[in-house]
Amino acid sequence: KFLPHIDNNYDFAELLSEWLGELNVSHTGGRYYASGQSEPTASLGLLFDWNYRDKGMRIAEVIEKGPFDNASTKAKAGIIIEKIDGTEITPEMDYYTLLNDKAKKKTLVSLYNPQTKERWEEVVIPISGSALNTLLYTRWVKQRAADVDRWSGGRLGYVHIESIGDDSFRSVYSDILGKYNN
C-alpha cells in the first residue's frame, strides 16, 4: 500500500521507523543521513561561558581527557581563547568554523589570562565530534554518581548501565562487587 509512494531514502527510513514502532521492539531503528561534502567540526574539549560577550571565548571548563587536559597546558576556567590558527575570534562570529576539518591535526591556539594579563600560544590536537560526545557522556555519568553520593550522604551508590553488552555488564558487576560492596 505504501510502497508506490516511497521514492527516496528519507521516506523509506520514516516508513521503517513506523513499522518498528508497530512491532514494539527496543534497540532497533532506521535512519537516513543525507550525504554531502560537509567538513566535520573538531572540538578543543572545552566548555565555554556563553554569557561572555567580549572578543574570544572564555573557558568555563576543561573536559577531562580532552586536548587541553594535560600537565603542560595553562588553559583553565576563566582563560580566554583569542585566536585559532591565527584567526581572531570576534563576538559576532561562529568560532566553530575555525575548527572545521581540524580533528587529529595540530592546531595553534592563542590564549589570554585576564587576571595576569599574560598571553601565550599552545598547540593542541582537536578531537572529533564523536570523541567529544564520548567524553561528555563519561562526564555526565561521573556527575550523576557524585550527585547520588552527595544526596545520600554516601549511603547509596550509582550504577550506570551504558548498554546491553559484555563490557557494560562487567563494569556494573565491578561497581556492585567493588566500590559499592559495603
Regions found by a protein language model. Name each.
Residues 60-61, 67, 82, 86-182:
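Cleft-lining beta-strand/loop regions that shape enzyme active-site pockets
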Residues 5-16, 74-75, 88, 92, ...:
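Solvent-exposed, acidic/flexible segments
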Residues 2-54, 118-137, 141-142:
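Extended, small/polar residue-biased N-terminal targeting/export presequences
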Residues 39-92, 166:
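PDZ/PDZ-like domain segments forming the peptide/carboxylate-binding groove
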Residues 37-40, 50-53, 74-76, 102-103, ...:
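Extracellular/periplasmic catalytic domains that process cell-envelope and extracellular macromolecules
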Residues 17-24, 45, 74, 153-156, ...:
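Glycine-centered secondary-structure boundary/capping sites
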